[in-house]
Every structure is written in C-alpha cells, then in structure tokens.
A protein has these predicted regions:
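N-terminal secretory targeting modules
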Residues: 1-31, 35-44, 54-66, 96-98, ...
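Sec-exported extracytoplasmic/periplasmic mature domains
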Residues: 54, 58-59, 85, 110, ...
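A short, flexible beta-alpha/helix-coil linker loop
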Residues: 35-37, 112-114, 157-159, 198
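Extracytoplasmic/secreted proteins, especially bacterial periplasmic and envelope-associated proteins
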Residues: 48, 52, 79, 97, ...
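Active-site segments of SGNH/GDSL-like serine hydrolases
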Residues: 108-112, 139-168
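Catalytic His-Asp segment of secreted/periplasmic serine-dependent ester chemistry enzymes
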Residues: 155-225
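Conserved SGNH/GDSL esterase-like catalytic core that processes O-acyl groups on lipids
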Residues: 37-125, 130
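Structural recognition of the beta-strand scaffold that forms the well-ordered cores
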Residues: 28-31, 36, 67-71, 103-108, ...
C-alpha cells in the first residue's frame, strides 16, 4: 500500500512540474506587413525581427509556439480589420482564434498605408486619423483577451522629407497604444535617415541588421517584464 502511495505521489509531482513548465512557456503571434513577415530589401521573405524574438524565446525555453500566418508584404490596417470582422481563415487558421491563444503579440501595420499616401498627401492628416481609427478596432479586439505583452511597432521615415507627417502618425499611434496599455516601439529614433539599417536607397525595408535591432528592443522589454 505504501509503495502504491509513493508511486502516486511521484506521478503527481512529475505532473505538477510538467504543467508548471508548460505554463511558463508562451505562444508568440506576430501580425502585419513586410516587417512582421521578415521580407528583406530584395523583396524576399527572409529572417525578420519576429524570427529573432522566436529564437530568444526558444533558447530561454519560453517558447510554446510561434505563428506568423497573418503576415503579408502588402497588408494594410484595413486588411486585418476585415480579416477579424469576417473571421477569415488562412492555412486553416483564423486570426481571431490565434489572438485568443497568444501570450505575446507583435504588430507592424500602417507603413504601407503611409507610404502609399505620401505621393498624394492632400488631407493626409485626416487620412491618418481614419487609419488609426481602424487600427483602434484591431487593438480593441485584442484587448478583450489576456496577453502577457502586446508590442506595436511605430513608423519611420527613410525619405528625409515629410517628417511632420510621420511625427503626427507616431504621436497618435502611441496615444492609442497607451489607451490599451500596449507597448509602443519607437522606430523613428533608430531608423530615420540611418543608412546602417538599409542596404538600398529609396527602399524602406530594413536589412538584417535593422530587423535584429528591432528584435533587441522588444527582447529587452520582454526580459524586464
């Protein structure tokens, strides 16, 4: 009888340890445009900031699962709004379900929207206001569920012009992030007019050093959480 009891205690102890280890691991979801997809300056899907974050979580034995299904070079904010509203699926997964599962979320959206509008920047501040109202819909949905961390990437300007437009967009994006207590990642201080992180001129896609720099900023915040 004692032997059976000891075996039962041992089994329960192992089960509790296993469960605690599993509970400490995190489901990492990244959403968004070319930055979250990890597209390099040559237009090829390569190693992005989210892949470096995934590597950190894996090496520190904190990674449960990593998902970048809902990333695409051409995604705009309105695309993600539509995907959520209509519960659209991709590769047999829905973003709605993935958001509910995620412990850590990183999002990069709006760069495509901004650079598209720069060629015709009439009423651009109204355009940005409407763009961020749509972004708010996404963040409001995410906020309904518990997450350890949500990181939102800000905007940067590689053109050397229209800085006031990017400052306005970043200021209001940060206000939206603060509203939900999500972490805003300031990229403009690092990337604006910094050729170190861009291998091709007239191209706002960072090189591998740029992606690694983004990941370092986010990883540092994860460590300090």
């Amino acid at each position: 009888m004692k032997k059976v009891f000891l075996i039962l205690i041992l089994f329960l102890s192992c089960y509790i340890i296993y469960n605690n280890t599993l509970d400490n691991k995190m489901y990492y979801l990244t959403i968004g445009d070319f930055l979250s997809k990890g597209t390099n300056e040559y237009g090829i899907s390569s190693y992005g900031y989210s892949d470096f974050i995934k590597d950190y979580l894996y090496k520190t034995k904190k990674l449960k699962e990593y998902n970048k299904t809902f990333t695409d070079n051409d995604y705009r904010i309105s695309d993600i709004v539509r995907i959520l509203e209509y519960n659209e699926s991709k590769n047999n997964e829905t973003l709605n379900r993935l958001i509910k599962k995620a412990d850590i979320i990183t999002i990069s959206l709006g760069m495509n929207d901004l650079y598209y509008k720069l060629d015709n920047n009439q009423k651009i501040y109204t355009y940005i206001d409407n763009m961020l109202l749509d972004y708010d819909k996404i963040l409001n949905y995410i906020n309904k569920f518990h997450h350890n961390e949500v990181f939102i990437l800000g905007y940067y300007n590689t053109s050397g012009q229209d800085n006031d437009i990017f400052e306005y967009a970043n200021y209001n994006l940060k206000k939206t992030c603060d509203k939900y207590k999500f972490t805003y990642i300031n990229l403009s201080d690092i990337f604006n007019n910094n050729p170190k992180y861009f291998s091709k001129s007239n191209n706002f896609t960072p090189n591998i050093k740029g992606y690694e720099k983004i990941s370092q900023i986010i990883v540092e915040k994860i460590k300090n959480n």
